Amino acid sequence: MALYIKDPTVDRMAEKLQERLGVRTKTDAVRIALQHELDRVEDEIPLREKLAALRQQARDRLGPPVHGIDMKKLMDELWEEGE
């Protein structure tokens, strides 16, 4: 199946990539570019997983929650000390 590039800008980009990569054809250049993009997308870690890892790091650094502390009272006292 042939790949026909109708957009002149995309055609110039393919030619430029062909020259820089030193490959025989624009098809080779497009194949390499598409493979790189597929690899990048497949290797990308989903945002949900990134956020879960960050939350876990925060939990590890902060330690377990301290029960029995009135956080509002504590924060009010800390703010009053700064004035």
Swiss-Prot record:
Pfam families to which the protein is assigned, alphabetical: PSK_trans_fac
InterPro entries per the UniProt record, alphabetical: VapB-like
Protein name: Uncharacterized protein R02378
